[in-house]
């Protein structure tokens, strides 16, 4: 499980583990499921969704939305297609072309926190993580973690630059095989995150080709209730679940810790979808 760029490395890691298990490579890893929160998985779909989300949330005007859709979105889509066939340089080009969409939206957003549009951006990362950095860089903590003298930073420029080639690649492609073999997938997203917003995530999940796609698309959204209050909207069929989390931004566990914990507990126990079954039974009985 992971969030944000985990939308890339969680599917890749899960696919590799599953492949190794199928081929009896080394020690069998008992992979049961994977979960991604506000992730970037299918850039072609998610970047195209930026203008729609920004318009829906009142960040940009209809005029700006339409201009983005006519000029920058088609250029992004073409660049991503080339990235998928021509390797490294074209993927860097796609990164530049597609992030013009995001940059243009931010230009109109007026200093909004792109991880939580209800807030203003503070510092280079839009959040103050200085206390976390101080804690993790204590010598006693580094010794406990076994990382030696490596200094922790919230965002490593070196790692960021190394991953630019990978950024615009579609990591959804390995997921259908996992679903077909009964490995569970939970995609969840806080509703106020812009950068990896719930709308783009919902769209790639709905567009994904697998044997249960038709049934998943046709299934209804039902309330995800925590302590008697609606904490989100849940959609599920078979091994696939999608949860839009209310009153949360990019970092759901930070914004809604109780809801996040309950989500993970129910999902790992296999009971997250039971609320959907109960809702459908209630409708049928009526």
From Swiss-Prot:
GO biological process, one term: proteolysis
GO cellular component labels: vacuole
EC number(s) given by UniProt: 3.4.16.-
Lineage: superkingdom: Eukaryota
GO molecular function: serine-type carboxypeptidase activity
Pfam families: Peptidase_S10
Family of this protein: Belongs to the peptidase S10 family.
UniProt protein name: Serine carboxypeptidase-like
Organism the protein comes from: Pisum sativum
